[in-house]
């Protein structure tokens, strides 16, 4: 049996669409919808859906506040662990699945037990013949998606491909990967970066991972991110990544990686502020904060992408 964890935050429309697709899914599973302190009517709407659908086992786990993506999922895993499932699946609420997506993953996990982390092929929801990714690879602190933006016909392999990066959008794994607290994801980052950090840990530990190509889901890419202030979202991404790479590698590696990343950062910052001096100020702030911080907190997140007052603080 697979325990599926779905995190909801003010996103009942997407979550209910995801549940409707899971109601037709094959295989043995139970769904835990973790409401991450929604301020709207999400809890009432999701509970109403559960009460009216007996064909699928769905349990609602309401949290008292927004704990962020990683901690919210970890809290869901704590609850699901009480059922001692054979496997877990983290699934974004802005996805919709094909009926056989889960059983394809389950069957592959039985026939290829050496792979301890699996991912389905993920296509765009609004362009269903276009691939978002088939996992990816990590190299020198960089991530590259496999088949990103390619048509379905571009995938020639049968069965699976080995990967070293897996997105948190759909992450199938075995219980032994949970830590002593029953958690999977780092809680250093309130929003974002958790899948990159997880993939770095798995690569270091030599944990085999694969994308199962005949398992398919659709993703409404960026649904939660659409609510964020754009410039803050860009800075948040780089701050998360710089801290993550620094903490996982030597000083020499981090400095070399920073030099390689600097032109890309500058280009993105220049698109945001349209001045050279403003771009350099953002670069300097990024480098300073990435050296001083070991985590990106909820306060940092809200200052960057909600209130847009992060740069008013020293």
Language model regions located:
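Catalytic donor-sugar/metal-binding loop of nucleotide-sugar-dependent glycosyltransferases
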Residues: 183, 187-190, 196-218
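Short beta-strand-to-loop acidic/aromatic patch adjacent to the donor-nucleotide binding site
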Residues: 84-96
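Acidic donor-binding loop at a coil-to-helix junction in glycosyltransferase catalytic cores
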Residues: 166, 191-197, 233
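Glycine-rich, basic loop-to-helix element that forms the pyrophosphate-binding segment
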Residues: 62-83
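Short, acidic, metal-binding catalytic loop of nucleotide-sugar glycosyltransferases
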Residues: 20-29
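A conserved acidic beta->alpha catalytic loop
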Residues: 12, 21, 35-46, 65, ...
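Acidic/His-rich active-site region of diverse nucleotide-sugar glycosyltransferases
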Residues: 62, 71, 96-183, 188
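Non-catalytic, C-terminal membrane-associated alpha-helical segments of glycosyltransferases
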Residues: 232-240, 250-314
């Amino acid at each position: 049996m697979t325990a599926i964890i779905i995190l909801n935050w003010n996103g009942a429309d997407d979550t209910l669409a995801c549940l409707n697709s899971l109601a037709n899914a094959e295989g043995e599973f139970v769904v835990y919808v973790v409401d991450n302190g929604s301020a709207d009517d999400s809890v009432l709407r999701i509970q109403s859906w559960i009460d009216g659908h007996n064909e699928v086992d769905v349990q609602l786990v309401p949290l008292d506040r927004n704990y962020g993506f990683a901690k919210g999922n970890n809290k869901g895993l704590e609850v699901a662990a009480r059922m001692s499932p054979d496997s877990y699946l983290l699934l974004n609420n802005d996805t919709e699945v094909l009926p056989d997506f889960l059983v394809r993953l389950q069957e592959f996990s039985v026939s290829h037990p050496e792979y301890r982390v699996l991912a389905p092929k993920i296509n765009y929801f609004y362009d269903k013949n276009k691939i978002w990714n088939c996992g990816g690879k990590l190299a020198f602190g960089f991530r590259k998606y496999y088949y990103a933006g390619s048509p379905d016909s571009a995938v020639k392999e049968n069965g699976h491909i080995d990967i070293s990066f897996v997105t948190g959008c759909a992450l199938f794994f075995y219980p032994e990967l949970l830590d002593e607290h029953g958690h999977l994801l780092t809680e250093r980052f309130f929003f974002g970066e958790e899948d990159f950090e997880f993939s770095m840990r798995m690569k270091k530990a030599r944990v085999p991972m694969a994308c199962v190509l005949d398992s398919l889901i659709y993703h409404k890419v960026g649904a939660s991110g659409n609510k964020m202030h754009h410039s803050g979202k860009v800075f948040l991404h780089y701050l998360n990544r710089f801290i993550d790479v620094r903490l996982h590698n030597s000083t020499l590696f981090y400095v070399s990686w920073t030099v390689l990343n600097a032109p890309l950062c500058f280009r993105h910052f220049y698109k945001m502020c349209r001045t050279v001096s403003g771009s350099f100020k953002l670069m300097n702030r990024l480098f300073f904060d990435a050296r001083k911080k070991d985590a990106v907190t909820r306060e940092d997140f809200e200052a960057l992408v909600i209130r847009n007052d992060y740069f008013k603080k020293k």
